[in-house]
């Protein structure tokens, strides 16, 4: 048996073909959902039927805040991530009750991945999120560290959760650092050396 499984795949043909959300190709949408979310259900269902995961084992999938908030350009991937998180809750109850297996999703900062590079304006979103987050964007390596924590026995009673790993981005409405990008009248928030005092 195994102790943990990571689901980390996502792809949208609509995004790749630059189809807007109000002009989706539905065959492509089905592919988006199948690859990015339904595959998570298939993976868990197969593991359960094979009794492949040890008691208190851990299943983790990578999500994004666009599952719960509107992000222009994220397109049908937002729908896929919302489904992904729902699967974690629904299957998390069944697998937890019957085999004490944990299922969670991690909502990661914008990360410059192959899949992410297909999202229009990803570089600007990456910069904006970094300015908004008090701790800055979480890197891919830091996400891997967090996954290891979620695989470990230290989180044996954490299940059916969507856990934000985004430097605080999801809890910030507007940061001074982001405002300073657009508002040039914030000089009073600079120290004697001209550095912006982030609050």
What are these regions (language model features)?
Residues 115-116, 142, 174:
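Acidic donor-diphosphate engagement hotspot in glycosyltransferases and nucleotidyltransferases
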Residues 46, 50, 152-156, 174:
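Generic structural signal for alpha-helix termini and adjacent loop/cap motifs
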Residues 1, 14, 27, 176-199:
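Non-catalytic terminal and boundary segments that flank Rossmann-like NAD(P)-dependent oxidoreductase
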């Amino acid at each position: 048996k195994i102790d943990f499984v990571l689901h980390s795949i996502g792809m949208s043909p609509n995004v790749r073909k630059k189809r807007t959300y109000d002009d989706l190709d539905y065959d492509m949408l089905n592919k988006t959902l199948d690859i990015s979310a339904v595959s998570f259900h298939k993976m868990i269902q197969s593991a359960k039927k094979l009794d492949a995961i040890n008691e208190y084992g851990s299943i983790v999938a990578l999500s994004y805040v666009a599952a719960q908030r509107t992000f222009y350009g994220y397109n049908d991937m937002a729908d896929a991530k919302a489904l992904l998180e729902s699967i974690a809750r629904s299957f998390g109850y069944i697998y937890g009750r019957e085999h004490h297996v944990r299922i969670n999703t991690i909502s990661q900062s914008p990360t410059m991945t192959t899949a992410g590079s297909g999202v229009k304006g990803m570089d600007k979103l990456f910069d904006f999120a970094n300015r908004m987050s008090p701790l800055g964007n979480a890197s891919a390596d830091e996400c891997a560290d967090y996954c290891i924590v979620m695989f470990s026995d230290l989180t044996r009673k954490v299940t059916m959760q969507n856990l934000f790993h985004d430097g605080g981005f999801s809890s910030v409405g507007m940061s001074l650092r982001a405002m300073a990008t657009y508002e040039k009248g914030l000089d009073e928030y600079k120290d004697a050396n001209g550095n912006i005092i982030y609050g």
